Curated annotation (Swiss-Prot):
One of its GO terms (biological process) is vacuolar proton-transporting V-type ATPase complex assembly. The keyword Transmembrane applies. V-ATPase is a heteromultimeric enzyme composed of a peripheral catalytic V1 complex (components A to H) attached to an integral membrane V0 proton pore complex (components: a, c, c'', d and e). The chain crosses the membrane at residues 422-442, 470-490, 549-569, 582-602, 641-661, 759-779. One of its GO terms (molecular function) is diphosphate hydrolysis-driven proton transmembrane transporter activity. InterPro entries: V-ATPase_116kDa_su, V-type_ATPase_116kDa_su_euka. The modification N-acetylalanine is found at A2. Disulfide bonds: none annotated. This is V-type proton ATPase subunit a3. It comes from Arabidopsis thaliana. Expressed in etiolated seedlings hypocotyls. Keywords: Acetylation, Coiled coil, Hydrogen ion transport, Ion transport, Membrane, Phosphoprotein, Transmembrane, Transmembrane helix, Transport, Vacuole. Belongs to the V-ATPase 116 kDa subunit family. It is a multi-pass membrane protein. The gene is VHA-a3.
């Protein structure tokens, strides 16, 4: 299958439409040059290695220790990246080449730097924790001190008031009161207290739990701290309250301590003595200033160390990633029996054979190997991977095609046509040259700044737009083209190419139908005559035009898809598919909808008033009836009968012969009677055989083949109708876009203009801009994009595209520097 070239004779080879010719190669590499060989092949990026040790676990492979070593170095580099990111230290651009440094030196250097950085971080964390604890302690001293000082003042005031009252009372009562006072003083209970901070969101629950646990035998006061404080345990900012709890007895104290621990409340010692409090505040403030100086010095040393790491970070990162990738690939190679050579197998394009051999030779010379590597091509029945060479212009279109399914090996590539048809169908739905210019300007910014933007991390949506910038460029150019055809600039018509061909008979003709218009000049040379816009017949005329145009475009693209199936069949030498798939499909589709397209063109050319709906419906319901006024050309009835007969005959031609022919070819192949039919087998059977590897006699289930063909036939017959109707979305979305644009212009911009008020005009212009950008340039663009995508995936590609291949994924270093592990 793969070895066959393009179709000969009248058929072009279509090299641009086929994936690159691939070959399965075997490399026998000496152990001493294996590492350098894989490195050079990674730089080349044209070999997809096969895993020859798939039965072994990762730990049983030859280079498991080296991969573990590289993984440890990669962990250290990730640690450095996180630390640099937190400190705001950027990594400098790579200077020098990674080949100039030795991996052992890198490993030693990384280990030393990590140990030093970990030690600095540990010391800094301890100092920062102490600093945060002292900050909390200082707040407790301040807030609790305020509470105690206010309590002392209020107690002193109350005592003075009580003494003054007692002095004025009767002298007979004085001994009695003094006796009572002396009795009370002997019964006084010593109260203890605890101070600390509790998170504010837990403060109410904390107070309630304390009250219940001690049965109300506590007194608690809380004070709010205005600014958030850094918690010493978590290192995060938190809003907290200072609390003071008074209790009686050791049992109550133990309960309070447990509750404080459960709520994460930090406790700090506190003295009742006011003089001692002031002394403690002074001591804490002094220690805080000392710690602050020490922490700043530690952070400065840490930043110097991180800047040293940043100078070589990119170089080390690339070196470690490359080494890890090389050892992963070496683990896919198998040892030969002598354990002196490694054997590799993989896919590569045929054109790369010379480059691969040059890389092998350079690796042998550079590693001073006594023996060179052996390169040989293997014969196989496996299906090769699919490889299309793309550039930055075509890669996005190829990604759109591959999102549906990767092409089978050397299957015709829809991307060749999609480069043009996708933006064109988008533009049919988005035809407005004003909107097209807006999208063009935005896309030109992405293209002009592509070098700068390519090196930056963009958001998900922006990343997607940047990746498809050339697709959007084509979409905008085609939108300008179709907008000129529709003669719409933000829904406003302009006589760009010539004056209108029509004039009004009287002043009121703009409100009438086209009967009020007189043709006074030549037909408008390009696109739609601007006189249609604003007339009563604008909508019926545009509906008729765009609906018929959608059918013509749809039938043309579906015919292109069927023609591509012919070239696929020629390429894979499957005459069964030519005679019993391509020809019946072409006959069926064009007998019905090809005929409808011809009628549309004839009606346009002749100006006939024939009802094409009536013609097509009664072509099936009453084929023998006369057409009458709906006849467009002589012998139309006879032609319709012939076309209807051909359409009916083509259905059994698609369904019945192919399964029986495949069965006969299978029997002949395995009875040894004939070998010629091998080339004419259906390509789907080739894939099954190839996938089976060494199976000599594949199973042939006639019932499965017949049911598959039955489904395929029914799908095509019904799809011919539904797919044609599906292309009417071109008409519907184009009409919706035009009407929305017209509504925004007339009901927002013109309405605001009519008020003669500058404020209303500014508001109206802003609403018009936001509505145009948000709805028409964003939502409508996305909607038209998705509908164009569906038309290509379903209506076009299902006519010929199997898409059951797998992508060529070579071993390469190109993306190693940009991808995160």
């Amino acid at each position: 299958m793969a070895e066959s070239g393009g179709g000969g004779g009248c058929c072009p080879p279509m090299d641009l439409m086929r994936s690159e010719t691939m070959q399965l190669v075997q490399l026998i590499v000496p152990m001493e040059s294996a590492h350098l060989t894989v490195s050079y092949l990674g730089d080349l990026g044209l070999v997809q290695f096969k895993d020859l040790n798939s039965e072994k676990s990762p730990f049983q492979r030859t280079y498991a220790a080296q991969i573990k070593r590289c993984g440890e170095m990669a962990r250290k580099i990730r640690f450095f990246r996180d630390q640099m990111s937190k400190a705001g230290v950027p990594a400098k651009e790579m200077q020098g080449k990674e080949n100039d440094i030795d991996l052992d030196d890198v490993e030693v250097k990384l280990g030393e730097l990590e140990a030093e950085l970990v030690e600095i971080n540990a010391n800094n964390d301890k100092l920062q924790r102490s600093y945060n604890e002292l900050m909390e302690y200082k707040l407790v001293l301040q807030k609790a001190g305020e509470f105690f000082s206010s309590a002392h003042r209020s107690a002193a005031d109350q005592q003075r008031e009580t003494e003054s009252q007692q002095a004025g009372e009767d002298l007979l009562e004085s001994p009695l009161l003094q006796e009572e006072k002396s009795i009370d003083s002997t019964k006084q209970v010593k109260l203890g207290f605890l101070t600390g901070l509790v998170p504010r969101e837990k403060s109410m629950v904390f107070e309630r739990i304390l009250f219940r646990a001690t049965r109300g035998n506590i007194f608690i006061r809380q004070t709010v701290i205005e600014e958030p404080v850094i918690d010493p345990n978590s290192g995060e900012k938190a809003e907290k309250n200072v609390f003071v709890v008074f209790y009686s007895g050791e049992r109550a104290k133990s309960k309070i301590l447990k509750i404080c621990e459960a709520f994460g409340a930090n406790r700090y010692p506190f003295s009742e003595d006011l003089g001692r409090q002031a002394q403690m505040i002074t001591e804490v403030s002094g220690r805080l200033s000392e710690l602050k100086t020490t922490i700043d010095a530690g952070l400065g040393q840490r930043n110097i160390l991180l800047q040293t790491i940043g100078d070589k970070f990119e170089l080390w990162n690339l070196k470690v990633r490359k080494e890890k990738a090389i050892y992963h690939t070496l683990n896919m190679l198998s040892l030969d029996v002598t354990k002196k050579c490694l054997v590799a197998e993989g896919w590569s394009p045929v054109f790369a054979s010379r480059e691969i051999q040059d890389a092998l030779q350079r690796a042998a010379v550079d590693s001073n190997s006594q023996v060179g590597s052996i390169f040989q091509v293997l014969r196989t029945k496996e299906s090769p991977p699919t490889y299309f060479r793309t550039n930055k212009f075509t890669s996005a279109i190829q990604e759109i095609v591959d999102a549906y399914g990767v092409a089978k090996y050397q299957e015709a590539n829809p991307g060749v046509f999609t480069i043009v048809t996708f933006p064109f169908l988008f533009a049919v739905m988005f035809g407005d040259w004003g909107h097209g210019i807006c999208i063009l300007l935005a896309t030109m910014y992405l293209i002009l700044k592509e070098k700068k933007l390519a090196s930056q991390k963009l958001g998900d949506i922006m990343e997607m737009a940047f990746g498809g910038r050339y697709v959007i460029l084509m979409m905008s150019l085609f939108s300008i083209y179709t907008g000129l055809i529709y003669n719409e600039f933000f829904s406003i018509p302009f006589p760009l190419f010539a004056p209108s061909a029509y004039d009004c008979r009287d002043v009121s003709c703009s409100e009438a139908t086209t009967i009020g218009l007189i043709k006074v000049r030549d037909t408008y040379p390009f696109g739609l005559d601007p006189v249609w816009h604003g007339s009563r017949s604008e909508l019926p005329f545009l509906n008729s035009l765009k609906m018929k145009m959608s059918i013509l475009l749809g039938v043309s693209q579906m015919n292109l898809g069927i023609i591509m199936s012919y070239f696929n069949a020629r390429f894979f030498k499957s005459s069964v598919n030519i005679w019993f798939q391509f020809i019946p499909q072409m006959i069926f589709l064009n007998s019905l909808f090809g005929y409808l397209s011809v009628l549309i063109i004839i009606k346009w050319c002749t100006g006939s008033q024939a009802d094409l709906y009536h013609v097509m419906i009664y072509m099936f319901l009453s084929p023998m009836d006369e057409l009458g006024e709906n006849q467009l050309f002589p012998h139309q009835k006879t032609l319709q009968l012939v076309l209807l007969f051909l359409a009916l005959v083509s259905v059994p031609c698609m369904l019945l012969p192919k399964p029986f022919i495949l069965k006969k070819q299978h029997e002949a192949r395995h009875q040894g009677q004939a070998y010629a039919p091998l080339d004419e087998t259906d390509e789907s059977l080739h894939v099954e055989t190839n996938g089976g590897g060494s199976h000599g006699h594949e199973e042939f289930e006639f019932s499965e083949i017949f049911v598959h063909q039955l489904i395929h036939t029914i799908e095509f017959v019904l799809g011919a109708v539904s797919n044609t109707a599906s292309y009417l979305r071109l008409w519907a979305l184009s009409l919706a876009h035009s009407e929305l644009s017209s509504v925004f212009y007339e009901k927002v911009l013109l309405l605001a203009w009519g008020y003669n008020n500058p404020l209303i005009l500014i508001v109206g212009v802003l609403v018009f801009i936001f509505a145009t950008v948000g709805v028409l340039l964003v939502m409508e663009t996305l909607s038209a994009f998705l509908h164009a995508l569906r038309l290509h995936w379903v209506e076009f590609q299902n006519k010929f595209y199997e898409g059951d291949g797998y992508k060529f994924a070579p071993f390469t270093f190109i993306f190693t520097a940009n991808e995160d592990e």
